[in-house]
Design a protein with these regions (language model features):
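Domain-core detector
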Residues: 1-168, 172
């Protein structure tokens, strides 16, 4: 099996749609309800992060398995990483609400995206695989710098607090 450019682009597009949709739904919630009720904001954000984060993790599992098959790696099936827990979502909502409430949708998108990145890295660490940041689309200078590091052995050093490091909502 070979991973074609078309397959890879479809994968990236599907992940991006999940991230964007979660952010859009958060925006659609905030527009009529506002940000005054923190408990409701956290509960809604947590629901979005859980639902769309699970989708992101599942897509990452599917691509990881396809890549492993293409490489004849002989590794176990990929296991999804857990989406952000309630406490993580609450911290994001509280910090973002107090600094710049307009960024709440981006915070939700970032946590959704992180579930997919965490899934890939969790399985790469388990399997002793190598990984690389591969920018696609709009990418910040720091992500470009990370990509310039090339292939790296997956290990606990690549994880920050158990998560993929430097995940932006808008960097592909």
């Amino acid at each position: 099996m070979q991973i074609t450019a078309k397959m890879w682009n479809e994968y990236i597009s599907r992940l991006s749609r999940l991230n964007r949709k979660a952010g859009q739904l958060m925006r659609q919630y905030i527009d009529p309800h506002g940000t005054a009720n923190t408990d409701d904001l956290i509960a809604y954000a947590y629901g979005l992060v859980t639902k769309y984060g699970e989708g992101s993790a599942e897509l990452a599992c599917q691509m990881y398995d396809a890549l492993a098959e293409a490489a004849n790696a002989g590794v176990p099936a990929a296991e999804p990483a857990a989406p952000a827990d309630y406490g993580e979502v609450a911290r994001m909502v509280n910090a973002t609400k107090n600094q710049n409430p307009a960024n709440l949708p981006n915070g939700v998108s970032r946590l959704v995206k992180r579930a997919g990145a965490d899934t890939t890295l969790k399985n790469a660490v388990r399997d002793g695989a190598e990984w690389a940041w591969v920018p696609h689309g709009d990418t910040c200078p720091f992500c470009i710098t990370l990509a310039s590091n090339g292939w790296q052995k997956a290990g606990s050093k690549v994880l920050k607090g158990g998560h993929a490091e430097h995940i932006h909502a808008n960097c592909d």
